[in-house]
UniProtKB/Swiss-Prot annotation:
Stated name of the protein: Toxin coregulated pilus biosynthesis protein S
Keywords: Periplasm, Secreted, Signal
Stated role: The toxin coregulated pilus (TCP) is essential for successful colonization of the small intestine.
Gene Ontology cellular-component terms listed: extracellular region; periplasmic space
InterPro entries linked to this entry: Toxin-coreg_pilus_synth_TcpS
Main location: periplasm
Subcellular location: Periplasm; Secreted
Organism: Vibrio cholerae serotype O1 (strain ATCC 39315 / El Tor Inaba N16961)
Signal peptide residues on this chain, from the entry's feature table: 1-20
């Protein structure tokens, strides 16, 4: 009788060990899947932050556009050709150009200028407001007709 009881208790113990081992394996699989899901969530959150930051950077680079309609006067304003010539000369005299930075990739030089308060990027031969950008060795100039502006 003792042998039967010991045999039954040994069988019961081995069965309970097998069940415990199976439960342990299942819990390990669940732990691994939970850890993988946590890692995926962290990756998605980081990707979301990256896209938000790149959007903020893109918005900061883009100039703000005033979408309000310009106010038009009901009567057209007629100016004489002398007044127009004076205003054109006045505009040309106020062309203020400063070199912000230069990017040289070995094939092409791209110059970024602060032009009347706005940043623009130009390469040799580009036109801006009727002015041609000329880069000749170490000289940087804007020319329009017989007028030349040297950039220091």
């Amino acid at each position: 009788m003792n042998i039967k009881l010991s045999f039954i208790s040994i069988a019961f113990l081995s069965l309970s060990f097998n069940v415990a081992a199976n439960e342990f394996e299942k819990s390990q699989e669940h732990y691994k899947s939970v850890t993988d899901l946590k890692n995926k969530i962290e990756i998605l959150e980081l990707e979301k932050k990256i896209t938000e930051l790149s959007g903020e950077i893109r918005n900061a680079r883009m100039p703000k556009i005033d979408k309000s309609a310009p106010v038009l006067s009901p009567q057209p304003v007629v100016k004489s050709s002398e007044e127009l010539q004076k205003s054109i000369e006045h505009i040309e005299e106020e062309l203020k150009v400063e070199l912000a930075y230069l990017v040289n990739n070995g094939q092409q030089k791209k110059y970024t200028f602060n032009l009347n308060g706005k940043l623009i990027t130009l390469v040799n031969g580009d036109f801006v407001n009727g002015w041609k950008f000329i880069e000749d060795q170490n000289k940087i100039q804007f020319s329009k007709g017989n007028k030349v502006i040297d950039v220091n």
